[in-house]
């Protein structure tokens, strides 16, 4: 079988006999490189560069080793360090698999083999443990006991689980299970036993088995992957295998010295190189219309969106056009732009514009001499406060409605739905508002909102949602005029990528629809309703002119947050209704964390002073643990963040930490994430959105654990904050 893509193209620089051999590096090889001492790292880089130039050179001494794979070889780096390489029996693909001390490298290679799955065609490093039953398999490395049954799908031995015993070889292979592991997989009886095999299984197999165990059919899993498993596979053609998305999730082809040096010098930034097969397929290829990708916290939605922007800029964007990448806050936009610059070439970045939507609207309207100043918070804006006070003075006192009611009604009904007249207000949906308003009462309430808008207009002010509506109208008018006159459209974007979609309301989605024509690859959304921290922004795409039917996907694997942190966060949302961004329902049952770590029980204290004491205790314990590791030459550099509900609480805790001799930094809209790793980060729960840290302490109010309907929003905030953590998280309530 020839190594071809769907279009018939071969891997660059390979093909006919005599062409330069193909050199690939595995995920494990790069991960090991990241751990090497500096002096050894330099030697590995020099050796790997020479290997990339010509892996068949006489100076490279391949040594036979004891391994279950007869094609694995050891290559000397210096007296003590060895590289493990797959040297093909036929073909021209040489694969760097591992690097370590002599004995450790040999031990790693002993029970491993590089094989091609005969159904999927993917390259897989298979771990052939010398065990005869699942019971002897190594257990999951967990420091605490996992609950027996837990909402969210990551439970213990008693969690309902489907058996794999009746699945055919073809089905298991199609899910990604290596042929050598079929018998062991069939004996798995619980989710915990599947976790015990996690290190032995390719990622796509682990995910597929988890979904089948949780209740999905094999056909459902394969259908969601859009994977063909009906083609003949040559299990010796590694060149063809490298073209499979499953292979590219763990192997990368090295094309030149510069590429190899870049990867080896920044091995921790593996998100730039490896994508899960599902992410890879979503990031590449043409789509016939808008795409929506859902995924819980830590599932790689933003990484996927960045890779999608790169692919579109390089493959589907004409000269003179751009891909717009937009998100909710300025901090996130700056962080994404920095990451895109490390992912994309300067030429590709010329075709990508990154801007949060508020900033985009401001620039767009200003360029068209918009006569109004946009109000982003009426309670903080002097002009808006005066306009609101005037409107409140005109309300009908006989209705017995509070000012808070009017404030929330205007936000959650009038602005959210773009209501601009009494008749539209009569027909507006008011689900979840808690107060029933008959038609006569709506007629009596409406003049207050009408008066407020008139008062704003006299002051040349506009609420942000109304400004968005004006921007949408201008875009639609400009497009219609260009079409009527036969001129080229003034729309400069070929595609729009939207991150944190759950926090964009109806007017935002309608604006995004108007930014780009209805063509292939027009809109790409990633989001998660569980992380909506602005309740007024719940919207349905289908009611904003965005049709995602047949183009909706989901990411299930959590790469960031440990199972223990995720379980604690998910428990807060048990019973909370969550939408799928299009008036449907979403759930967390099938999400799965790939890592385990320490678990800390929720702490409830009486007051802020006690909460501060507990926060300082956490930080000191973490600092002492890191110091102990560093004393043993295990250099660690782990970030810690304290996330709180208000700036007042933030200031109080920060001052105490400073008095304890800790360096601190406050993350706000103007503060970039550039502080030294040892500095404790401080942020409000809202400001922490989209960020990640090694360790997190969340300080909230005990009232967040009250009635579900009344506390749903506070629970979402705590969920978002806890899932910013990669290794450890503590929740303190006062």
Model-predicted segments: where are they?
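Basic, Lys/Arg-enriched alpha-helical interface segments
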Residues: 1-82, 87-243, 429-432
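Alpha-helical hairpin
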Residues: 25, 36, 201, 274-275, ...
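Short amphipathic alpha-helical boundary/capping segments
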Residues: 32-35, 269-274, 394-398
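Accessory N-terminal region flanking or inserted into the helicase ATPase core
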Residues: 238-277, 294, 401-494
């Amino acid at each position: 079988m020839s190594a071809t893509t769907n279009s018939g193209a071969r891997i660059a620089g390979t093909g006919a006999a005599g062409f330069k051999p193909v050199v690939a590096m595995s995920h494990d090889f790069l991960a090991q490189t990241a751990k090497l001492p500096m002096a050894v790292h330099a030697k590995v880089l020099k050796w790997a560069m020479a290997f990339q130039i010509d892996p068949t050179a006489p100076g490279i001494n391949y040594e036979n080793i004891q391994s279950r794979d007869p094609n694995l070889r050891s290559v000397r780096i210096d007296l003590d360090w060895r590289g493990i390489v797959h040297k093909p029996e036929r073909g021209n693909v040489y694969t760097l698999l591992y690097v370590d001390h002599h004995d450790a490298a040999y031990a790693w290679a002993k029970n491993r083999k590089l094989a091609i799955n005969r159904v999927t065609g993917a390259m897989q490093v298979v771990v052939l443990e010398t065990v005869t039953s699942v019971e002897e398999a190594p257990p999951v490395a967990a420091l605490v006991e996992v609950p027996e049954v837990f909402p969210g799908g990551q439970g213990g031995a008693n969690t309902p689980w489907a058996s794999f015993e009746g699945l055919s070889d073809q089905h298991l292979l199609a899910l990604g299970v290596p042929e050598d592991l079929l018998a062991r997989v069939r004996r798995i009886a619980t989710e915990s036993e599947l976790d015990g095999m996690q290190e032995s299984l390719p990622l796509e197999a682990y995910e597929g088995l988890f979904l089948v165990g949780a209740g999905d059919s094999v056909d459902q899993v394969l259908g969601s992957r859009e994977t063909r498993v009906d083609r003949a596979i040559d299990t010796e053609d590694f060149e063809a295998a490298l073209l499979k998305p499953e292979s590219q999730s763990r192997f990368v082809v090295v094309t030149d010295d510069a590429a190899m040096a870049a990867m080896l010098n920044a091995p921790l930034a593996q998100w730039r190189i490896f994508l899960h097969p599902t992410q890879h397929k979503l990031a590449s290829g043409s789509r016939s219309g808008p795409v929506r990708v859902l995924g819980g916290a830590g599932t790689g939605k933003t990484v996927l969106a960045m890779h999608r922007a790169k692919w579109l800029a390089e493959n589907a964007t004409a000269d003179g056009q751009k891909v717009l990448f937009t998100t909710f806050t300025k901090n996130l936009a700056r962080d994404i732009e920095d990451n895109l610059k490390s992912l994309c070439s300067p030429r590709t970045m010329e075709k990508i514009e990154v801007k949060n939507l508020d900033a985009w609207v401001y620039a767009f309207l200003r360029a068209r001499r918009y006569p109004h100043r946009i109000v982003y918070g009426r309670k903080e804006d002097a002009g808006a406060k005066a306009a609101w006070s005037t409107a409140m003075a005109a309300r009908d006192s006989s209705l017995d409605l509070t000012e808070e009611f009017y404030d929330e009604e205007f936000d959650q009904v009038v602005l959210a739905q773009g209501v601009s007249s009494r008749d539209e207000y009569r027909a507006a949906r008011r689900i979840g508002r808690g107060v029933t308003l008959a038609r006569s009462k709506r007629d009596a309430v409406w003049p207050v909102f009408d008066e407020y808008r008139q008062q704003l207009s006299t002051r040349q002010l506009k609420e942000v949602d109304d400004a968005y509506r004006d921007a949408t109208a201008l875009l639609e008018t400009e497009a219609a005029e260009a079409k009527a006159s036969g001129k080229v459209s003034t729309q400069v974007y070929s595609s729009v990528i939207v991150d944190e979609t759950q926090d964009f309301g109806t007017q935002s989605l309608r604006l995004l629809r108007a930014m780009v024509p209805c063509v292939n690859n027009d809109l790409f959304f990633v989001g998660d309703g569980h992380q909506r921290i602005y309740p007024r922004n719940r919207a349905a795409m289908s009611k904003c002119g965005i049709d995602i039917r047949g183009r909706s996907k989901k990411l299930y694997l959590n790469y960031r947050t440990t199972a223990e942190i995720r379980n604690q966060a998910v428990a807060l949302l048990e019973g909370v209704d969550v939408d799928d961004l299009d008036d449907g329902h979403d759930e967390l049952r099938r999400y799965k964390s790939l890592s385990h770590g320490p678990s800390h029980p929720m702490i409830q204290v009486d007051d802020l002073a006690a909460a501060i004491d507990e926060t300082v205790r956490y930080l000191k314990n973490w600092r002492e643990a890191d110091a102990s590791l560093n004393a043993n030459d295990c250099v660690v550099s782990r970030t810690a963040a304290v996330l709180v509900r208000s700036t007042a609480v933030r200031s109080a805790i920060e001052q105490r930490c400073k008095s304890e001799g800790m360096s601190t930094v406050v993350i706000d809209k103007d503060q970039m994430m550039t502080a030294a790793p040892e500095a404790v980060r401080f942020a409000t729960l809202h400001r922490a959105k989209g960020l990640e840290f090694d360790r997190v302490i969340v300080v909230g109010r005990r009232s967040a654990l009250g009635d579900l309907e009344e506390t749903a929003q506070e629970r979402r905030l705590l969920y978002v904050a806890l899932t910013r953590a990669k290794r450890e998280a503590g929740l303190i309530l006062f």
